[in-house]
Curated annotation (Swiss-Prot):
<feature type="binding site">
    <location>
        <position position="48"/>
    </location>
    <ligand>
        <name>NADP(+)</name>
    </ligand>
</feature>
<dbReference type="GO" id="GO:0009423">
    <property type="term" value="P:chorismate biosynthetic process"/>
</dbReference>
<keyword id="KW-0285">Flavoprotein</keyword>
<keyword id="KW-0028">Amino-acid biosynthesis</keyword>
<dbReference type="GO" id="GO:0009073">
    <property type="term" value="P:aromatic amino acid family biosynthetic process"/>
</dbReference>
<keyword id="KW-0521">NADP</keyword>
<feature type="binding site">
    <location>
        <begin position="238"/>
        <end position="239"/>
    </location>
    <ligand>
        <name>FMN</name>
    </ligand>
</feature>
<dbReference type="GO" id="GO:0010181">
    <property type="term" value="F:FMN binding"/>
</dbReference>
<comment type="similarity">
    <text>Belongs to the chorismate synthase family.</text>
</comment>
<feature type="binding site">
    <location>
        <begin position="293"/>
        <end position="297"/>
    </location>
    <ligand>
        <name>FMN</name>
    </ligand>
</feature>
<dbReference type="InterPro" id="IPR020541">
    <property type="entry name" value="Chorismate_synthase_CS"/>
</dbReference>
<comment type="pathway">
    <text>Metabolic intermediate biosynthesis; chorismate biosynthesis; chorismate from D-erythrose 4-phosphate and phosphoenolpyruvate: step 7/7.</text>
</comment>
<dbReference type="Pfam" id="PF01264">
    <property type="entry name" value="Chorismate_synt"/>
</dbReference>
<keyword id="KW-0456">Lyase</keyword>
<feature type="binding site">
    <location>
        <begin position="125"/>
        <end position="127"/>
    </location>
    <ligand>
        <name>FMN</name>
    </ligand>
</feature>
<keyword id="KW-0057">Aromatic amino acid biosynthesis</keyword>
<keyword id="KW-0274">FAD</keyword>
Amino acid sequence: MSGNTLGLLFTVTTFGESHGPAIGAVVDGCPPGMSLTEADIQIDLDRRKPGTSRHVTQRQEADQVEILSGVFEGKTTGTPICLLIRNTDQRSKDYGNIVETFRPGHADYTYWHKYGIRDYRGGGRSSARLTAPVVAAAAIAKKWLNEQYGTEIRGYMSQLGEVEVPFTDWKHVPENPFFAANADIVPELETYMDALRRDGDSVGARIEVVASHVPVGLGEPLFDKLDADIAHAMMGINAVKGVEIGAGFDSVSQRGTVHGDELTPEGFRTNNSGGVLGGISTGQDIKVSLAIKPTSSIRTARESIDKAGSPASVETFGRHDPCVGIRATPIAEAMLALVLMDHALRHRAQCGDVRVDTPRIPAQAPGKS
């Protein structure tokens, strides 16, 4: 397995399995001299961790991060930062019935055929549990980006199954377990999820992520365009099946007179580009939407096969999220932060001394969106 590292100058390599003794990440390329403590990282981990409501997996993991290297006297040293999160609530016996079978929609079948061996306990390496070290590593990137540029990365759920969640205000996002930017719809979402759990089924979700105060110039055309790397990273999140940037697939029905974001001395009139033109950041908000599929591990019996190729019925009894999208918001924020951090360092290395006479216009003209 060779696809465990993300980034070029700011790299993150994750390790571990869902039911192993620990999971973690090695972060390399972080500039020296930045103040960093475990508490800085723990904030985002607590937003992602399991067992925080009845609507997510009831696996109880504290997800307490340990910094093993790369920080001395409270500051980054420029050397690799090793982050460790110990697994404490594994229950491997729940997976005894899938040792010889494959869950429909899960990585069981493909991992078996590719590697000839698979850790069936909680999905092993393919588990969404491995997003915890990603979130931990990204907390470092978020901190550096904010200190350098004032960059802020926020996300919210805009759809849960068939239920659309209209955006009303960012302040509501931390107030509910769905990361919904709408307080009024939370009771409906809770009723929806309670019914789904009783049915032994699962559902997908749509997540929106926005990065504000991003500097102009991030991205490396042609093949390391900023939006290309964002899409690549987002597709690395478990259960993500679609990525849109800016207007996304709505661009198909837009005319050029609408889609092209007009520039004025006061700022951009619109942001259909999602903050990226020609693979390079414009300084506008970077807007990303994710489509997340329903959880594969469900209590309803499904048709499958066993290792011999014979018909089998599969029902999963482990503790699972009926909608992995509920906890996906901080994970999506994390992936965007990692890509922006890597590209910020790459831009600084090659083009940090580039100067042009044209002024940088505001991200948004007054009265426009």
